Amino acid sequence: GEDATVNLLEQKVAQLFNHEAALFCASGTMANQIAVKAHTQPMDEIILDKTAHIYYYETAGYAFHSGVSVKLVDGKNGIISAGQVLENIQPNFDWLPKTSLVCLENTSNKGGGSCYDVQTIQEIKNVCTDNQLKLHIDGARLFNAIVSKAYTTHRIGELADSLSVCFSKGLGAPVGSVLIGNATFIRKAR
């Protein structure tokens, strides 16, 4: 970016979540869609809860912008488990989509504000690592989850390949979200 204030905001948020870089976006939907695009290839498949914002409220942007399909998981109040992720990874078969990304919404809007425990996220991250999948956290209300579950921004940042954090929800800002990740990912996102 060209604006020194935005650059400083991106830098501070990246550091807050123990990542290298960040990208200011106009909305959470924009940040999530950029994350999906940067983590996937056309014809890949992403795993997410059936009530996740990326599926339920983002008008199939994943299909339009990234050319990917979704594997919907029936979590409990919007919270999925590592076992459910593992069960829904597509086998390596020529005419099946390649599973490449898991997306978690924390907190879960349609789940009534349910929050992931850090242990559950760690277990999902382990499955992702073992199966060469990326993990994105849609953190529209992530600051609420951090307070509710008493984990730190650094810890949640360590577990995710990317995160989106919304400023208009938990912080009451008029607009904006930040997409957070490593420097290579954010360069691709830009």
What are these regions (language model features)?
Residues G1-R190:
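Conserved PLP-enzyme active-site core in the AAT-like
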